[in-house]
């Protein structure tokens, strides 16, 4: 159903959305992937599903991309005619869904401890980025980054651990992602989020054990780069201190160069 924005596909920008700063944890990766099969209603998938892509929305990078400010993001469409009525109708439907979807990212500011807990003593190769809670489902995003020589083996190992009910592994424009799904979380329920964080760490432990069966060495420590990202996000979200997104960005060249 979903495509990727590459040179081989028909891809055009249909809308631009302004996203609050609580989603700027995703801005470090230049994109927010969206699981359209989950997010769109059945009739919306029938009408517009073929025009969506894993990339979801993509950050519009400017000279002044500051973590402490709301950012603008572009929405893609993959139909064959950007001037068709179907494309224009799709634009309004998809834009409304995205605007509702990103509201669920408020937890990234409200519960900043979640990222710090999940990423504690974990390798950068499987890095928790942020969360979206939408229609009673908590989407938990991990960026995947392995050396090219072991990338394929590691991705296959991760897929063996993840069934469709638990989550999905996908390739987007700038990164590879693992998106876990939790059905018991609530933005207002602190205890459920604590339980979710513990569950997520247990899932990642299983994933890491499977990945380590491949010829790869993972350092079970919080990287200095992740500590800098956490510090920058906390200063930006809580104190309004501006940090340039480009200086902290995370882009996986394996995905970006389509390896």
Curated annotation (Swiss-Prot):
Quaternary structure note: Interacts with E1B-55k.
InterPro entries xref list: Adenovirus_E4_30/34
Record family assignment: Belongs to the adenoviridae E4 30 to 34 kDa protein family.
Name the UniProt record assigns to this protein: Early E4 30 kDa protein
Pfam families (alphabetical): Adeno_E4_34 (PF04528)
Localization per Swiss-Prot or TrEMBL: Host nucleus; Host cytoplasm
Signal peptide: none
Originating organism: Canine adenovirus serotype 2 (strain Toronto A 26-61)
């Amino acid at each position: 159903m979903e495509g990727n924005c590459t040179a081989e596909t028909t891809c055009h920008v249909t809308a631009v959305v302004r996203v609050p700063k609580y989603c700027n944890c995703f801005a470090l990766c230049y994109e927010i992937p969206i699981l359209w099969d989950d997010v769109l209603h059945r009739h919306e998938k029938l009408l517009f599903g073929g025009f969506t892509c894993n990339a979801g929305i993509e950050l519009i990078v400017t000279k002044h991309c500051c973590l402490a400010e709301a950012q603008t993001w572009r929405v893609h469409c993959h139909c064959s005619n950007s001037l068709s009525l179907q494309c224009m109708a799709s634009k309004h439907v998809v834009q409304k869904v995205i605007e509702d979807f990103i509201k669920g990212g408020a937890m990234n500011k409200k519960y900043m401890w979640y990222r710090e807990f999940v990423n504690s003593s974990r390798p950068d190769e499987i890095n928790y980025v942020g969360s979206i809670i939408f229609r009673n489902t908590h989407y938990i995003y991990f960026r995947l980054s392995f050396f090219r020589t072991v990338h394929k083996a590691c991705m296959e190992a991760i897929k063996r651990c993840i069934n469709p009910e638990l989550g999905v592994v996908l390739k987007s424009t700038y990164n590879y992602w693992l998106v876990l799904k939790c059905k018991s979380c609530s933005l207002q329920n602190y205890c459920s989020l604590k339980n979710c964080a513990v569950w997520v760490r247990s899932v990642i432990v299983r994933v890491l054990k499977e990945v380590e069966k491949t010829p790869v060495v993972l350092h079970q420590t919080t990287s200095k780069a992740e500590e800098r990202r956490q510090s920058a996000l906390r200063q930006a979200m809580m104190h309004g201190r501006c940090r340039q997104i480009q200086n902290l960005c995370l882009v996986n060249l394996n995905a970006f160069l389509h390896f």
